[in-house]
Amino acid sequence: MAKKTTEAKKTVTVEQIGSPIRRPAIQRQTLVGLGLNKMHRQRTLEDTPAVRGMIRAVQHLVRVVDEK
C-alpha cells in the first residue's frame, strides 16, 4: 500500500511587470506557459526546477512576489 505524503509543496508567486510586445516569440510563449498574459497578473505556481527555469528565461518581464 502506498504511503500518503502530507508535506506541503513549495510554491512561488510571480507577477508580470513587463510587456511582451516587441519581444521574441519564445519569451511570449514562456509567459503563457507560466499562466501570465496581461500586465500585473499574479500566479502561484509549484516551485519546481522547470518553473524556476521559465522564470529565469523571462526575468526581465516578471517579478517573484512570494516564495513559500
UniProtKB/Swiss-Prot annotation:
Q: Which Gene Ontology CC terms are recorded? A: cytosolic large ribosomal subunit
Query: What biological process terms from GO does the record include?
Result: translation
The record's disulfide annotation reads none
InterPro entries given for it?
A: Ribo_uL30_ferredoxin-like_sf, Ribosomal_uL30_bac-type, Ribosomal_uL30_ferredoxin-like
What keywords were assigned to this record? Ribonucleoprotein, Ribosomal protein
Q: Per UniProt, what is one Pfam family of this protein?
A: Ribosomal_L30
Q: Which SUPFAM superfamilies has this protein been placed in?
A: Ribosomal protein L30p/L7e
Q: Which domain of life is it from?
A: Bacteria
**GO molecular function per UniProt:** structural constituent of ribosome
**Presence of the UniProt keyword Lipoprotein in the record:** no
Quaternary assembly: Part of the 50S ribosomal subunit.
Q: What protein family does this chain belong to?
A: Belongs to the universal ribosomal protein uL30 family.
Q: What is this protein called?
A: Large ribosomal subunit protein uL30
Encoded by which gene?
A: rpmD
